[in-house]
Amino acid sequence: WVYKKLGVGDIMYRDYDSHVIQEGGFFQAEYNRNKLAAFVSGSLSNTTYWRYGRFYYDKDHARSKTVNYMGFTVKGGANYNINEYHNVFVNVGVISRAPKFAYGAFMTSTTSNVTNPNAKNEKIYSAEAGYGFKSAWLTANLNVYYTLWRDKAMTKTGTLTNKETGKETDYYMNMTGVGARHMGVELELKSEPLTWLSLNGMLSIGNWEWDNNATGYAYNDAGQPLTSNGGIASGVMADDHAW
């Protein structure tokens, strides 16, 4: 199709179907008595991915391998009303969820059936604690939080330049195992000093950082591994595969 005049309805570069099947179950239990309210919840899920590519594959090889990821969530929290004005609360949670279809489970989902052998469930561990105040004219909520992200999949794009010819090749880099740490303090205020006047204020102070050195490998738009000069590498994750 590179040297052919195309018309309405012609297909070029990509022609594929993404298939995603998800099954799961959920439960939640609650307790509410006197000044204390609490809950615990959880879920279990299975995510199935496969791809059917018609542009770069013949009929016998059009369907990719099927990959499955089991995930779950566990959450719990409690709130205690000290009196009619003051309350304190705490929440914790753990989440394990399937990587994304594109640039997660599949290396180049738009053009290739190649799956990512290093794709893992993304894990999130989070906790928060806070204090609340409520009166006739002022409502305030203060909370602190701490969240860890593990095995996150991310994509980076850029350009590789051949030092001898100057030719530039666009690449994408599929990174897995990315970790991050988020922590901070949040304050929310709402005041109604007059019946016709409402004032709202918010303050958020956070420290969000990447906390590991993740490795990714460079590929072109066709899903081929690239060298640091933009050429085709000898294999996926081979010695000459750019990372």
Mark where each language-model region is.
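Signature of Gram-negative outer-membrane beta-barrel scaffolds
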Residues: W1-N83, Y103, T108, T215
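Transmembrane beta-strands of outer-membrane beta-barrel proteins
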Residues: W1-V2, F39-S43, N91-G93, N141-Y145, ...
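Hydrophobic, lipid-facing positions within transmembrane beta-strands of outer-membrane proteins
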Residues: I21-F27, G42-L44, F72-G76, V88, ...
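Residues on the lipid-exposed face of transmembrane beta-strands in outer-membrane beta-barrel proteins
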Residues: G25-Y31, G76-Y80, A129-S135, V144, ...
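Gram-negative outer-membrane beta-barrel transporters
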Residues: N32-K35, Y146-L148, T169-W243
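Repeated loop/turn-to-beta-strand initiation elements of outer-membrane beta-barrel proteins
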Residues: K35-A38, Y85-V88, W137-A140, T195-L199
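Surface-exposed extracellular loop regions of Gram-negative outer-membrane beta-barrel proteins
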Residues: N46-Y57, T66, Y80-E128, T139, ...
